């Protein structure tokens, strides 16, 4: 199935806005020059790493605004028949817990980057994977225990989160049914009394 042209454009990250700005600047300076995408991406990545938080600020603001735009448009977007609507992620929902491997990565990523500066994200991940595979089962235990605790906490949090928005099923509607029958019985009794009165009048 082709892409739905009415589907909202995906949200852009602060880095994507930075790259877009750099590309536009490059086109203005060199309108006729062709761009080596790989080389251009590498330069953008290097420049982004050396930028201060203040320099990145305007791009982060643009990303925040675009996120608001995207979330607003996705709420009102109705996908074509046969295509499932992408489930909107509630930012307040509990985040899924990290696995033992990801907890290990968070601990050792700075070390790997420090040992080999300039590594790409992919190469860092590869080295972390190798380190993890070289660990003994005993060495992995602390990370697995932490992951287990995080999973238990997540399961409690997600249950509480799901129940928070639910309205409990009330019983009054069912309880009202017998009451209605009682009323009907009362009406029948009244009818019977009326009939008795009529009979008395006939006897007179």
UniProtKB/Swiss-Prot annotation:
UniProt entry keywords in alphabetical sequence: Chromosome, DNA-binding, Nucleus, Repeat
Stretches assigned to coiled coil: none
One Gene Ontology molecular-function label: double-stranded DNA binding
A Pfam family annotated for this UniProt entry: HMG_box_2
Domain of life from the UniProt record: Eukaryota
Biological process terms in GO annotation: regulation of transcription by RNA polymerase II
Listed InterPro entries: HMG_box_dom, HMG_box_dom_sf, HMG_boxA_CS, HMGB
Compartment annotation: Nucleus; Chromosome
Record's keyword annotation contains Nucleus: yes
Compositionally biased tracts (Acidic residues): 181-204
DNA-binding region: 8-78, 94-162
Chain segments carrying region Disordered: 162-204
Family annotation (SMART domains): HMG
Primary site of residence: nucleus
Family: Belongs to the HMGB family.
Its biological purpose: Binds preferentially single-stranded DNA and unwinds double-stranded DNA.
Name this protein carries in UniProt: High mobility group-T protein
Organism of derivation: Oncorhynchus mykiss
């Amino acid at each position: 199935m082709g892409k739905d042209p009415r589907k909202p454009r995906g949200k852009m990250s602060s880095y994507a806005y930075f790259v877009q700005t750099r590309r536009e600047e490059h086109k203005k300076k060199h309108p006729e020059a062709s761009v080596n995408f790989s080389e251009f991406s590498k330069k953008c990545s290097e420049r982004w790493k050396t930028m201060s938080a203040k320099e990145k600020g305007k791009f982060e603001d643009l990303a925040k605004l675009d996120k608001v735009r995207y979330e607003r448009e996705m709420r009102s977007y109705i996908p074509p028949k046969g295509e499932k609507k992408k489930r909107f992620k509630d930012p307040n929902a509990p985040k899924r817990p990290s696995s033992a491997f990801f907890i290990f990565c968070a601990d050792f990523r700075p070390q790997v980057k420090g040992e080999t500066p300039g590594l790409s994200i992919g190469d860092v991940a590869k080295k972390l994977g190798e380190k993890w595979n070289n660990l003994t089962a005993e060495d992995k235990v602390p990370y697995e225990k932490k992951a287990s605790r995080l999973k238990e906490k997540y399961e409690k949090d997600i249950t509480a989160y799901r129940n928070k928005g639910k309205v409990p099923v009330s019983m009054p509607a069912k309880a009202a049914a017998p009451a209605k029958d009682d009323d009907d019985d009362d009406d029948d009794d009244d009818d019977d009394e009326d009939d008795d009165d009529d009979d008395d009048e006939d006897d007179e």
